[in-house]
Amino acid sequence: MAGRKGGRGKRRKVCYFTANNITHIDYKDVDLLKKFISERGKILPRRVTGTSAKYQRKLTVAIKRARQMALLPYVADE
């Protein structure tokens, strides 16, 4: 039979932005944006970070703007 043996089930991830009452994601806030980027420089998906769809879209736009303004790298250094 498929399924988990023992232990607890998966814990539901909560959206970072709704939990902290953040309504505006600023592209200049590089420290916040770096939390949602992988070590290779890719944007982490919702299933990994737990952000809601609304804030994932805003986050993606902010990261892309920060990359355009050279605040964040497009790819990570080797």
Curated annotation (Swiss-Prot):
Keywords: Ribonucleoprotein, Ribosomal protein, RNA-binding, rRNA-binding. GO terms for molecular function: small ribosomal subunit rRNA binding; structural constituent of ribosome. It holds the Pfam family Ribosomal_S18. SUPFAM superfamilies: Ribosomal protein S18. GO terms for cellular component: cytosolic small ribosomal subunit. It comes from the Bacteria. The keyword rRNA-binding applies. GO terms for biological process: translation. The keyword Chaperone does not apply. Coiled coil: none annotated. Binds as a heterodimer with protein bS6 to the central domain of the 16S rRNA, where it helps stabilize the platform of the 30S subunit. Belongs to the bacterial ribosomal protein bS18 family. Part of the 30S ribosomal subunit. Forms a tight heterodimer with protein bS6. This is Small ribosomal subunit protein bS18. The lineage of its organism: Bacteria, Bacillati, Bacillota, Bacilli, Bacillales. The gene is rpsR.
